[in-house]
Amino acid sequence: MPAHMTHFAIKLGLALTLGLSFLTTPLKAAEQVNVYSYRQPFLVEPLFDAFTAQTGIEVKVIFAKKGLIERIKAEGERSPADVLLTVDIGRLHAAREIAQAVKAPILQQHIPAIARGSDDKWFGLTWRARVAYVSKDRVSERQLRFADLADEKWRGRICLRSGQHPYNIALFAALLDHMGEADFRKWLIGLKGNLASKPSGNDRAQVRKIYGQACDVGIGNTYYMGKMQTNEKSPEQKDWAEAVAIVFPSTPRGGAHMNVSGMAMAKHAPNRANAQRLMEYLVSKEAQKIYAEVNFEYPIRGDVAASDRVASWGTFTPDTIALDTIARLRKRASEIVDETGFNAGP
């Protein structure tokens, strides 16, 4: 090949190489943020649409019911994940090993200290209370303590999902902290003796059991009431919901047990600045209001009101235990559930 052609080929090859490199640089990434979400699409897509409209940043989402933390671990430094959205303090605590600390004054300002990690690796987005669903016809009490549920008057009247489910383990961990191990174990044995049957089903199944008169009191998260009340695909759930009232049992030091949905920034987030912008947006008044309307949960911000439907379920004082404390005690609470044979039923 003539020298001038060789020179041209080298220049062309270099140009193509630089061009391909340019296409894989963060130019496009700077206009997007990648979210791995355990939360269902209909819950978060209105938020992402509003964020994109406001900022021009495209939100790309991977939805899954399980395995996202493990996926991020497996992807390692090449992971495209920027933000993880999940529910329950157990999952948020587990996400710390794939997360990085975020020092953002906006997050510190609007998220209570008890609802974010002391290491700044996870942040609550919404509150959900774990409550008693009680039969309107067969239960007169509209105020209860969790301690009351071990009283003999409730023998054969309580229904519950598996004691090992993360929602119950979080509740039990909180009560373990409140009561101390000896009294908590005694209480759990009393609750076990009051079960109407072996723990089974999900939270809504407990309400169905109350409707069917299989029990009088069930334990569940508040937002399931909203899901049942508005369920057009399974309208029979509206009848279940109509059969019960929500009662907010208090913990021994006072206050209803609370858990959260939340977020974390992935350790190797390729779009860190955009990830932080999204996280900050999700605690804005606009986003908190959208979230509250869509998912029947309580805003993490104290200056944003719950939706009218959620507010109609009643007022309560939340427990002030730090969720980090609940996370720390989850393992021991789970062990005690096994040691007492709780899941074997009464």
Located regions from the model:
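Periplasmic-binding protein-like
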Residues: R157-Q164, Y281-G302
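Early extracytoplasmic/lumenal segment of secretory-pathway proteins
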Residues: A30-A94
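An extracytoplasmic/periplasmic, membrane-proximal ligand-sensing/linker region
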Residues: A182-F184, F296-P346
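Short beta-strand->loop
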Residues: Y36-R39, S118, V134-K136, E141, ...
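Flexible hinge/capping segments at coil-to-helix
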Residues: F123, V139-W154
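A structural signal for short loop-to-beta-strand junctions that line the ligand-binding cleft
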Residues: S79-L84, Q100-A132, A147, I158-L160
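A bilobed periplasmic-binding-protein/Venus flytrap-type ligand-binding module shared by bacterial periplasmic
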Residues: Y133-R138, M258-N271, I290-E293
